[in-house]
Amino acid sequence: MITVNSTSETLFNFPCDYSIKIFGKNCEKFQNTICTIVERHTHKLNPNKITKKHSSKGNYVSFSIRIIANSRIQLDSINQDLKNCNLVSYVL
């Protein structure tokens, strides 16, 4: 019988390249705030690894930030801190 271990540690080979997508209202502080949160858990972010897209009406914005992830704990911590930020609407 084959058992499948579904833990995320087995789904990723850390360290690995990982993309975080963050959505929120389009405001002045949004980019600096989310970059500061992500940098708490990683090294300085590379501006070339950050992409920004506006919604069709410009009310919302999404950022994709590529990082080198070192562990599932690190990813969970980043995700939780972003979710706790009142400027962030959604994190993928």
Swiss-Prot record:
Q: Which HAMAP family match?
A: UPF0250 (MF_00659)
Mind telling me which InterPro entries this protein's record contains? UPF0250_YbeD-like, YbeD-like_sf
Coiled-coil zones: none
Source taxonomy: Bacteria, Pseudomonadati, Pseudomonadota, Gammaproteobacteria, Candidatus Pseudothioglobaceae
Q: What is this protein called?
A: UPF0250 protein COSY_0496
A GO cellular component annotated for this chain's UniProt record is:
cytosol
Question: Which source organism?
Answer: Vesicomyosocius okutanii subsp. Calyptogena okutanii (strain HA)
Membership in a protein family: Belongs to the UPF0250 family.
